Amino acid sequence: MLFFSCRNGELIPPPDSVKQYLHISHTRTNNNNLIDSVAESISYQNFDMLWLGGDLTYTTSEDDGTMSYIDSIFTVSSENTLWSLGNHDYSELSRIQEFTNRLPYYSCFRDGITFLVLDTQDSLSNIVGEQKLLFDNVLDTIQESTHLILLHHKLIWMYGDFSLEQEIDSVSNGHLGSCFHCINPNRFWQDLYPKLVVVQKKGINVICVGGDIGVFTKEYEYLTQDNVQFLASGIKEGTNNNKALIFKHDVTNGYLFWEFELLENLTMN
């Protein structure tokens, strides 16, 4: 199975009939429970799926009013909206579950793609307990998929790799440390990555998509030597050149294309 990606703004033209998915993250403002005004004006109904990278508002789950506001924009109650929770979303997990009918971590299958949504706030960036059991079960049993996509807020794969760790302060909103919003020391490379490589070697393309960027950079790509793809997109409210990540999926042939797109361009569609 061939796999294409976009780099340097060059998008390989996909077939006419494709599905479109949007990854957007860190839409919060600094002093209220609204989202960035440009992000608010995007026509999200134009996309077949929404992948939310977390930190939607300043305290997203604090009250029903804010959750209803978020639901009116992103339709978080829809099975086609996948949400990896960030630290600013984490006030009341029970309220989020009431709106989404999901745990903070879950898996699903859509049109040949297996999705695994991780909760990187739980256990300070470590995937353990029931969440690790879910991870193991999905990766041990995955078969009829062209892609495995992991959605997560924190860039947990930046810790434990020398070259990636050097980039943390210029890429991730949260620095390396012990705080709740930090990239915490974790065992991604020991406990998760080897199984991702096994899946990749089966011919199933593995993509990890993080959401905790936007303050220092709006886009990030890194391909490991095992061809596991790391991506991240996020915005900072009120700044220029905010970007989201658009995926175009040729379901028939199993191709997945992506590009980073300026938010302003999405409001014109």
Predicted regions and their residues:
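N-terminal active-site segment of His-dependent metallophosphoesterases
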Residues: 6-67, 163
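Active-site glycine-centered loops adjacent to acidic/histidine catalytic or metal-binding residues
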Residues: 26, 54-55, 86-87, 153, ...
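Extended active-site neighborhood of metal-dependent phosphoesterases/phosphodiesterases
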Residues: 64-147, 171-179, 191-207, 213-256
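A solvent-exposed, charged loop/short amphipathic helix patch at secondary-structure junctions
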Residues: 49, 162-187
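Bacterial Sec-dependent N-terminal signal peptides
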Residues: 1-13, 196, 200
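Short acidic, glycine-rich surface-loop motifs adjacent to enzyme active sites
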Residues: 142-166
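Acidic, His/Gly-rich catalytic cores of divalent-metal-dependent hydrolytic chemistry
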Residues: 252-269
